[in-house]
Amino acid sequence: MDDITKKILEELVIDFISEMNEWEKYCNEFDEDQLELDETEHKIKQMVASIISKYCTDQERKMSRPNALSWGLEGSYDYDPNKEKIIDIQESRKNKFFVTTRTDDEYLQYIVVKKNNKYLIDSKKRKFLSEDKWSVDYL
């Protein structure tokens, strides 16, 4: 894999993590009463759907965002560019790449594919530092 591809993959994952973190911060601005309002839920769903469509492959994600709304709280965001750092980028086969990140207690692996000359995140896996096996994680 050349340096340009590596840089593109790095920027894709970092930008995705950053935008998801901003979305999580936005969601935390609402109190419980506001979150129960249909218009608030619609706006939150619309925002995350826009991020997913910008950075991820177009596929149905029944158990993942934007269909299943969840987000981390301040101090324990699901996506935090200050805590999640890229440690490895590998090409698994033509047009498929693994971008591995690390936080304080786990590894995350973003599976990126190249489709129609565009790089998109297809899925994500998780592995705690003490584990040997990757498990499916939701975007």
Each model region followed by its residue ranges:
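Hydrophobic beta-strand residues in large extracellular and virion-surface proteins
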Residues: 16, 86-89, 97-99, 110-112, ...
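Short beta-strand edge/turn micro-motifs at domain boundaries
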Residues: 107-138
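Core segments of small alpha/beta cavity-forming domains
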Residues: 1-65
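Surface-exposed, charged secondary-structure patches
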Residues: 46-105
